[in-house]
């Protein structure tokens, strides 16, 4: 039986992240805590590849399951003997998910792995080369999910913009086909790279079912820093792309790393001036921390933690102001918000609009899991509010 309280569980499956050293140490501490109360620990996720053998040999975990072996999880959980089933990094997930318990939207995994070689990232080593799921299988899954009432889909993967490179297709082509499925009102995307927005992707930018928010990973806005990071993008081309997308109404988010080795005051100043030119409305920004096994981890850390935090704060403030202005301008133009209501939090229903901004709604109606089209709303710095 599955229990909601892990303290009641005899077996706990830990789906681990390994993107940073702190993620590894956090997983290890969590595992030790579970073991102390006598439960069996099964390790899966990226940490199974990076730390699975070490933890298994130390008897810290009862079993290890790699991504390619997750179809065998039911049988493995019944095993009375310790097991190490890592599988391989070339497999393609063939599972079709038809239901997401307690979710208003559905997630479809379209690819696995990454062919990039960014200097700070361990993910290609633990997830393997980029490989695409079968396009017809993705479409079948989407049709079933739409039939089951999920009319917002979120496409996920390690590097979804690489979809189709190994099969002669593309993310744009896949999106075009998904958008024709009856019942689908909105398609959201995980993170994509600037270089992955090709002509086939541009062809679907004006489709009504495509979210009006794109998350495009810049990582930095200094040309010199991008070279140090072994990135494929160039700041000046990125700016052209972002301005183009902003002009046609997209809210734009990005990932950004501050404090990477080599981020001198001169490079930071250049990056900051460039950053201010980008019409960013959302930001996932973090201070660099060395990841064992990466090229960057062998470089001298020459930016202090305090300096990195200060730079982080500056970028967050810029984007927060941009986001506020973006929402104000949308309201002034008489624009409406299309919100899928996801939860009731106190007196407010909450959901995200087409620009991936949270909206709080007060109403006497039962609107959970419903779509709300909001024409009148109040824009505040912390979010948008409406009463219907």
What positions do the PLM features span?
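Proteins enriched for Cys/Gly/acidic motifs involved in redox and nucleic-acid/cofactor modification
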Residues: 1-162, 200, 214, 235-244, ...
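Conserved beta-strand core positions
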Residues: 11-12, 106, 153, 187, ...
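Short, glycine- and charge-enriched coil/turn segments that flank and shape catalytic ligand pockets
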Residues: 37-38, 78-84, 165-173, 247, ...
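Conserved SAM/AdoMet-binding glycine-rich loop
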Residues: 41-42, 50-51, 55, 147-266, ...
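Hydrophobic alpha-helical scaffolding
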Residues: 128-131, 190-191, 231, 261, ...
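Hydrophobic, well-ordered secondary-structure elements that form the walls
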Residues: 216, 255, 275, 283, ...
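Conserved loop-to-beta-strand segment in the C-terminal subdomain of adenylate-forming
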Residues: 291-297
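Terminal RNA-binding accessory module
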Residues: 298-388
